[in-house]
């Protein structure tokens, strides 16, 4: 695993964060050291796939990056005729995802597509995964994507939505941000790395509150919505059609 040192030295002109070749190369290390509970979420996606994925249905991993969630789901699917569609708009991520997925043998076909997830049709889905993806979409586009996902899910189909959250209580929000930064420092990131990455993400990642997520999911039709995992200001929700 290549170590993430992208922000370890001062950058004179710090641009917006992008999922380019350099990020794709170090992504597994970056994500493990940056998102508390990430491995637990990936494991649980497999557990949820074993329960909710139905025969002859599709599974979508929207914003699939290097395929961790795709592979977790595929390992646990126990129904025939299932196809997994992974989508990411970063060609370097897609290239590595295809290599990663092809390294593991399975009878379940996986199609990895380089495209904007807003352009993908969701059809005959028993499971859709948005694992730290929605937060990178413009806020005005989030409801329409979730509505499309709801329409494309089978009855009793599931959406797994993992996100970084913000909190309306400013003191609690500040505490959880500080705890997250402490988590990153404990994983070997310097103050400079934490600061520069935060600045790079400011314009491209806009977080919602848990309440805002729940309200929007209910508005598009989901009957059952619950937060099933949280660590500091990161977490994952399940929404059942």
UniProtKB/Swiss-Prot annotation:
Transmembrane segments: none annotated. GO terms for molecular function: carboxyl- or carbamoyltransferase activity; S-adenosyl-L-methionine binding. It comes from the Bacteria. InterPro entries: CmoA (IPR005271), Methyltransf_25 (IPR041698), SAM-dependent_MTases_sf (IPR029063). Keywords: S-adenosyl-L-methionine, Transferase. S-adenosyl-L-methionine binds at residues 38, 63-65, 88-89, 116-117, 131, 198. Coiled coil: none annotated. Pfam families: Methyltransf_25. Its EC number is 2.1.3.-. It catalyses: prephenate + S-adenosyl-L-methionine = carboxy-S-adenosyl-L-methionine + 3-phenylpyruvate + H2O. GO terms for biological process: tRNA wobble uridine modification. The keyword S-adenosyl-L-methionine applies. Catalyzes the conversion of S-adenosyl-L-methionine (SAM) to carboxy-S-adenosyl-L-methionine (Cx-SAM). Homodimer. Belongs to the class I-like SAM-binding methyltransferase superfamily. Cx-SAM synthase family. This is Carboxy-S-adenosyl-L-methionine synthase.
């Amino acid at each position: 695993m290549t170590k993430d040192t992208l922000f370890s030295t001062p950058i004179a002109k710090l641009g917006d964060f992008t999922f380019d070749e350099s990020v794709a190369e170090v992504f597994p290390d970056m994500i493990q050291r940056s998102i508390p509970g990430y491995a637990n979420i990936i494991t649980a996606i497999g557990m949820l796939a074993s329960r909710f994925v139905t025969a002859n249905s599709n599974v979508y991993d929207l914003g699939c990056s290097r395929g961790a969630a795709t592979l977790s789901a595929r390992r646990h699917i126990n129904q025939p005729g299932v196809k997994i569609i992974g989508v990411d708009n970063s060609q370097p991520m897609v290239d590595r995802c295809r290599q990663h997925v092809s390294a593991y043998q399975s009878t379940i076909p996986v199609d990895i597509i380089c495209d904007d997830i807003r352009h993908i049709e969701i059809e005959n889905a028993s499971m859709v995964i948005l694992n730290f993806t929605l937060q990178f979409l413009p806020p005005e586009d989030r409801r329409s994507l979730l509505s499309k996902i709801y329409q494309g899910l089978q009855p009793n189909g599931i959406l797994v939505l993992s996100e970084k959250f913000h909190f309306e209580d400013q003191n609690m929000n500040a505490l959880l941000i500080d705890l997250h930064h402490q988590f990153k420092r404990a994983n070997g990131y310097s103050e400079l790395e934490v600061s520069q990455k935060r600045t790079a993400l400011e314009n491209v990642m806009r977080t919602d509150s848990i309440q805002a997520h729940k309200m929007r999911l209910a508005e598009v039709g989901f009957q059952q919505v619950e937060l099933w995992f949280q660590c500091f200001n990161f977490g994952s929700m399940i929404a059942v059609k």
